[in-house]
A protein has these predicted regions:
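Bacterial N-terminal signal peptides
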Residues: 5-17
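Active-/binding-site microenvironments in catalytic and ligand-binding cores
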Residues: 20-264
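N-terminal secretory signal peptides that target proteins for export/translocation
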Residues: 1-2
Length: 264
């Protein structure tokens, strides 16, 4: 398995030398790739419920100090979130057991927003990957391949984002994503560490067999879905930190995704 520490990753990006074991983060722009969770958060159409925030306390206390606290509830798979390998792979790794080098890893961004604008069912192809590699070099093992479709600009309009807003019906969805053939190329040949996308699924909207999920899950590759802001990242050279809530036995969960982009 591809394993490398955070310091080594930053060294590869040119962030070091280290001084007294510190990292000069001023050399990086931090880009938030996460949608905020709220009542308008988009969930898969067949999900039970959405995001709920219950205020437990807000205001002055008898002791004279201010205090605020909330409780929240939500399905695992909504908003910017993790798909753990077990989501579509029996016996696969659960959310709490994903190795950190699958969550903190170099990012490669492939932009298909032009193609997706013409075809909402567009799927990344092997030709797209080969074109990318001719311009930017071979996708390295252990990298996160992030697919930019531009669909995040439609958030949180459910009909525009998912292609349909019929309650409890996932059969009419239309949005771009990865395709099975390119998933095999990336997972089996390039040996990438993760797949991410700025739409609701690493499978395209009209998928009926969720083959990309199945291929990724079988190889222990997590998925990061409903990302945003990928247009602010260069094709190569940034570092992705995609850290989910550590739910024991979870098939996924809310994700805070951030990229460190070297300042020019």
């Amino acid at each position: 398995m591809y394993r490398v520490g955070l310091a080594a990753l930053l060294l590869g990006l040119g962030a070091l030398p280290l001084s007294a074991q510190t990292i000069d983060l001023s050399r990086y722009e931090m880009v938030d790739l996460t949608h905020a969770l709220n009542a308008r958060t988009v969930f898969w159409p067949t999900s039970e419920g959405g995001f709920e925030l219950q205020r437990l306390a807000y205001g002055p206390t008898p002791g004279g100090y201010f205090y605020a606290a909330n409780a929240f509830a939500m399905p695992e798979h909504g908003g910017t979130h993790l798909d753990a390998p077990i989501h579509f792979a029996e016996g696969g790794v659960t959310a709490d057991r994903i190795p950190l080098d699958r969550l903190v890893l170099p990012a490669v961004v492939i932009d298909v927003s032009a193609q997706a604008a013409k075809d909402p069912d567009y799927r990344l192809t092997a030709d797209d990957v080969q074109t990318f590699e001719r311009g930017h070099g071979r996708i390295p093992a252990g990298a996160a391949v992030l697919l930019r479709t531009g669909w995040d600009e439609r958030w949180p309009d459910r009909k525009a984002y998912l292609g349909d807003d019929t309650p409890r019906d996932a059969s009419r969805l239309h949005f771009p994503s990865f395709g099975p053939d390119v998933a095999r190329l990336l997972v089996e040949e390039r040996r990438v560490g993760a797949l991410g996308v700025d739409v609701a699924s690493i499978d395209y909207g009209q998928s009926k067999d969720f083959m990309v999920h199945r291929i990724a899950g079988a190889h222990g590759v997590p998925g990061f879905e409903n990302l945003t802001g990928l247009g602010a990242l260069p094709p190569t050279g940034s570092l992705l930190l995609a850290l989910p809530i550590k739910i024991e036995g979870g098939s996924g969960g809310p994700l805070r995704a951030v990229a460190l982009v070297p300042r020019r």
